[in-house]
Amino acid sequence: VRITAGPFKHACDLNVKVLLQYDTDRLLAPFLREAGLPKKAETYGNWEKDGLDGHIGGHYLTALAIHYAATGNLECKKRMDYMVSEFARVQQANGDGSICGFPNSKKFAEEIRKGNVGIVWNYWVAWYNMHKTYAGLRDAWLYGKNEKAKKIFLKFCDWGVDVISNLDDRQM
């Protein structure tokens, strides 16, 4: 469905105007940091620096994909494709399929793999945070028609399954 006129088009245009004010490199900074890659910009403050680092990146990717699908806005597509490419670099640098922006995400996954599920209480909603990235990649694939996003998403899913594969029902 393409939105071409009326109040929904006006609302989409306002959304896109706001979306294009964000700096994608600032949104990607937590993911690059966790992958050991040099940041291209400093991360945003507040929640993006206080333990929930990276959660806006997934929301943003979803918004870009939806607005590209609904309006055909090429700047949304360009930014979506850029974020997907950067997530591919992060995933490759991590070497295990993960794409996480929250602090000490590798330690989190190691502890969960060992069955130490109590570690979740030391993190600010880690699974929620990762879900935003999962959803953003899924939306870039399904709505934005980005095939690279599909590959990255599925590899990230495989990583998530691997992290929890040894947990029993009680631990889940």
Describe these PLM feature segments:
Residues 1-172:
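Glycan-recognition and catalytic cores of secretory/periplasmic carbohydrate-active enzymes
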